[in-house]
């Protein structure tokens, strides 16, 4: 990607220091309307997904195990790839420029670590997870799902757009294996209470107690691995964590 200034000065989107794409060339609105009729290419069924186009080194016996829903700029997705090199993780993001950034970031990381095999286990899809999740994953495929700092949709009329609701929780339960985990983190207490209430009311989930949640090796990474989480830490904001097990 290349940007031309008013003085016809050409600026590449890649940092000469880090070799990674720079977010300022991929700016977009903080949120996107998930109900709007965006144009997406999506498979008719999970068997039709060409995973090798996203993971060139994937083995025939491997499949996506972790899904970061609304992955943003990919900070936590990259962390997942480093923490679990044997697992295949996917980030799903609805915003086009943001997903472009994540794809370019992964490409740059793979090039920087060429020969090591690092970051071959992560990828990003631009899609609407609120509509097309079962088109990508078969029943009981996923081990872990992450919903980190989702759009709170503060207005009551827009609560139906929240990514955690009763109808969608049933879809998540469909693609999540028994014993699988759903990780949620937000800096908005009202949204946290909404999430806990809806998941507690759903018969296919139970919340992990505080001790079990805090001893999960992923938990410390939830706070500031993502760009949103890091911003909350910088601003000395609150974090509200809840982890649920698929029954």
Swiss-Prot record:
Chain positions recorded as S-adenosyl-L-methionine binding sites: 70, 93-94, 128-129, 148, 226-228
Residue numbers annotated as active site: 151
Family: Belongs to the class I-like SAM-binding methyltransferase superfamily. TrmB family.
Native source species: Drosophila pseudoobscura pseudoobscura
InterPro entries membership: SAM-dependent_MTases_sf, Trm8_euk, tRNA_(Gua-N-7)_MeTrfase_Trmb
Reaction(s) the record says it catalyses: guanosine(46) in tRNA + S-adenosyl-L-methionine = N(7)-methylguanosine(46) in tRNA + S-adenosyl-L-homocysteine
Main enzyme class: transferase
Protein name: tRNA (guanine-N(7)-)-methyltransferase
EC number: 2.1.1.33
Known role: Catalyzes the formation of N(7)-methylguanine at position 46 (m7G46) in tRNA.
